Amino acid sequence: RLGIAGVVLSILVSGCAATYAQRDLMDIVAKLSPKRAVLVSTPANGIYGKIEYRSSGKITAQEVRTAFSKFASSATVISDCKDLQCLSRQQAAGSFSYLVVPQILHWEDRATEWSGIPDRIEVELRVFDGETLLEVGATVLSGKSKWATFGGDHPEDLLPEPLSNYVKTLYE
């Protein structure tokens, strides 16, 4: 009896936690300075099949800004830039030491509470030196929601933890 109860309990507990993965695309070239400012672009909205998730690009940029603001002297989102070229033009007018380009690779919002199919995200994050435009770090962060949910979960809920963990490695 205890063996069966243990198996059931482990299945339930494992379904109660979101899972995350980080796939670094390059080694971090140098640690970032916390005395420097960061400029973040706003990625295009996530799309799954024929569904465009409105505001997912804006939400992603804000979550990236939040993660960097814990370490940088300032972190700013620019809503009308989606790539490095645009950020570099904006950089000329400001004093940003680092340029961050997020890109939504996968964004899937599911009704997990009744379907059992988890929400999923995958976001590529590239960090550039604002002066030289050389890439100093790049990763792909992914997340999958917990199986046991009572509703109200969304893909953006999967962003803070992996973003925070990766950004921390850029500074520490």
Segments (PLM) and residue ranges:
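Sec-dependent bacterial lipoprotein signal peptides
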Residues: 1-16
